[in-house]
Amino acid sequence: RLVLMNPNSFKAKYNLDARTNSEVIRINRAKKTITVRNVLTNEEYTESYDKLVLSPGAAPIVPNVNGTTLEHVFTVRNVVDIERLQKAIVEKDAQNIAVIGGGYIGVEVAENLRLAGRNVTLVQSAPQILRPFDFSMAQILQKEMMDQGIHVVVGDGLAGITTESVILASGKQIKADIVVLAIGVRPETKLVEEAGLEIGTTGGIKVNQNYVTSDPHIYAVGDVIEVYHRLLHKPVRLALAGPAQRQARAVADHIYGIANQNKGVIGSTSIQVFNYAAAATGLTEEAARNAGFQVDSVYVIAPDKVGLMPSSNPLHFKLVYELPTGRILGAQAIGKGNADKRVDVIATLITMGGTIEDLKDLELSYSPMYSTAKDVVNMAALVANNVMAGRFRQVHVSAVRDLVESGAYFVDVREENEFANGHIKGAVNIPLSQLRERMSEIPKDKPVYVHCRSAQRSYNAVMALQGSGWDNVVNVSGSFLGICLYEYFTDVQTGREPIVTAYNFK
């Protein structure tokens, strides 16, 4: 079924013969024909081609566990699937729904079901939802889903489904009137395999830079193919709409003799999770390390627009870069404002081989209603530049718990009233406004970890201390707000002892 267009409008506007309810069941490469079956009448007929373009997409993955064929279990691939799911929920008056899978589809399905007033559990076998984001950034979105009433389960996979519940690998059972499988997708390659076309190492159709398959008369685009990743320098599968539409344009160009070779993908994505916009591009820090890159990252929390504006909100921004070159490898942004704009800037730089040096002086448009004079992307580059040059040292929020539990020395340079509303256990409060008079209280014989709310005041404190002879001071990236966001979800889910006296997300 067509959604945005119909066969009549295709014919009237573009002179295209669009055939719905029609399935291609065979490709005869020798004769350059396809066999088509009308799914309503079962009639079969043959069409010939000069060039054939394949875009069968990808099918939902159904795990090999008991219960996946039960009538209350659904997958989501298209509008028809959504309508079937919606009808079943209404007819059963289903109140408890389990969504299996924490990727984009799973998160979006869970959110919409929760907004419809259902009790929703999201189950993800990996340690986090939304793998295009690093673990530290995903914690912000997991907290948001939890705050909105979704029961988020991570690190526990699906073991089976009964008529009343889902059974997890841990043995836990979750009541479920409806189960939605959103574990991922696999390329629909049955037809092309039967036709003898080459399948790549990733399981997608192998194509060249012009999306030509192993048959020079057959092209393939979309979720069914593997694509070249320009940072990893290897084929990957990337089921995204943006690359798919560019592939379609490139195929049309090539058929008509227009040179337009594919240069590869970097994987730029975005999603809304309730009140937050989230976007990512390139490699996560984890993916970059796993690929063999020597990398570092900076995490900056800055206003998305001038702080005096009533709609100003914190924007969480992570920048991943290669050492020692400073080449930018990836970025992630999460906030209530325009996260996608910031990530699009980084995507452009990655595509052009840009570095931290390029980004720190990049001239971007500015208005108090939309940004700050020094945008968060510039700020992140300045921080990275300072770290690379050795002007100060930083520690990431992921390392703070171990430091606290080992008795490390923390100095909190927020004001006394901020400190009273929540702080790292054992931290010493020396407000930045009092620092120069109280420097003698800070030891020189062991590492001192300095933090504030978002790492800006603590950076100033670190530089002041270094200028006064302290060479043992380290800035906590993300500082107290970042620590609270990083720790909160796992603290609540596992019941472990918090490392803060109280969480403060303001």
Tell where the protein language model's regions lie, with residue ranges.
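Rhodanese-like catalytic fold shared by cysteine-dependent sulfurtransferases
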Residues: 357-368, 372-399, 403-409, 416-449, ...
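Rossmann-like dinucleotide-binding cores of NAD(P)H-dependent redox enzymes
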Residues: 3, 96-98, 104-160, 238-244, ...
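Mid-to-C-terminal Rossmann-like scaffold of FAD/NAD(P)H-dependent oxidoreductases
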Residues: 224-337, 368, 372, 376-402, ...
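Short hydrophobic core segments
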Residues: 48-57, 176-184, 248, 326
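Beta1-alpha1 glycine-rich phosphate/pyrophosphate-binding loop at the start
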Residues: 1-23, 61, 110-133, 268, ...
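A Rossmann-like FAD-binding core segment of flavoenzymes
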Residues: 19-40, 47, 115-209, 501-505
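FAD-site-proximal beta/loop scaffold in flavoenzymes
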Residues: 69-93, 164-167, 172-250, 345, ...
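Glycine-rich dinucleotide-binding loop and its adjacent helix/turn
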Residues: 54-116, 151, 201, 207-209, ...
